[in-house]
Amino acid sequence: MYNLARQLLFKLSPETSHELSLELIGAGGRLGLNAMLSKPPASLPVRVMGLDFPNPVGLAAGLDKNGEAIRGLSQLGFGFIEVGTVTPRPQPGNPKPRIFRLPEAEAIINRMGFNNHGVDALLARVEAARFKGVLGINIGKNFDTPVERADEDYLLCLDKVYHHASYVTVNVSSPNTPGLRSLQFGDSLKQLLDALRLRREDLEIMHGKRVPLAIKIAPDMTDEETALVGEAVFQAGMDAIIATNTTLGREGVAGLAHADEAGGLSGAPVRDKSTHTVKVLAQTLGGRLPIIAVGGITEGRHAAEKIEAGASLVQLYSGFIYKGPALIREAVDAIAALRSQAK
């Protein structure tokens, strides 16, 4: 059924089909249709960051930036949902067209630029959804906020989402906001992480609960840089690291239509680079900090490979667009099989 729907949706522009898909998933959630139309995955509980997940396969940020289909997406079988990236103020993002499909490679290039309705609009929808599962909220900075003052945007967002989020992801790795990736390195990273840690301490007292913080990183660093970032994230008292965001590289898509478009590449071509980043982080951290793996999961076995590389959880995005809800169940089953083999 999804294959037929995908054929119809793929006749539309990528952004139009994205918006229509979210509307349909949202409507299906309100009517309770999604749960009836999709076979739920087996229960595979896991505890990470002090949170209990019904299964380790989640939805990555970027698909539902504004929290418009939380209930509908949760009915498809995801073990957790991450919404955003959201910024303090609404912003339109980059000019259209800004999403490009490369179906031959099961890939997508996007240069969205953190288009979103703003943090207040997101939180209104989160409250309306009344979602009882694990909800991550991914936060970023506004386009016109200087990088030197980025911590102000992150702290403002953290203040607002803290009470509503199961965990908060700090996005310092999108390639589509100028200068953002510089926040992954050296003093800039330390300053941001220290500010987040101190603010979280205040919010924990204020709200009476400790909300985990995850840092999302890029796949385009050297092994040494990745190791340094991983160690810095651990030393700053963060709770997880998400690896990875999209890549600026074009390995695996050379010569394909749209391959030369500016933006971040996701999907199958980023799989190996993302998994390698997970391995480097796992070797560096030695189990001291959980890793959430995302990037290039288009088959169930790819999810198991991420877990084998050292991840505790995985997330889907491009693979979900190409393969549909069945991929969730495939990924859960593959991870369950891996666990059984390890016993």
From Swiss-Prot:
The keyword Cytoplasm does not apply. Pathway: Pyrimidine metabolism; UMP biosynthesis via de novo pathway; orotate from (S)-dihydroorotate (quinone route): step 1/1. Its main location: membrane. It catalyses: (S)-dihydroorotate + a quinone = orotate + a quinol. GO terms for molecular function: dihydroorotate dehydrogenase (quinone) activity. It is a peripheral membrane protein. Pfam families: DHO_dh (PF01180). Its cofactor is FMN. InterPro entries: Aldolase_TIM, DHO_dehydrogenase, Dihydroorotate_DH_1_2, Dihydroorotate_DH_2, Dihydroorotate_DH_cat, Dihydroorotate_DH_CS. Keywords: Cell membrane, Flavoprotein, FMN, Membrane, Oxidoreductase, Pyrimidine biosynthesis. The active site is at S174. It is found in: Cell membrane. HAMAP family: DHO_dh_type2 (MF_00225). Monomer. Belongs to the dihydroorotate dehydrogenase family. Type 2 subfamily. Catalyzes the conversion of dihydroorotate to orotate with quinone as electron acceptor. This is Dihydroorotate dehydrogenase (quinone). It comes from Stutzerimonas stutzeri (strain A1501) (Pseudomonas stutzeri). The gene is pyrD.
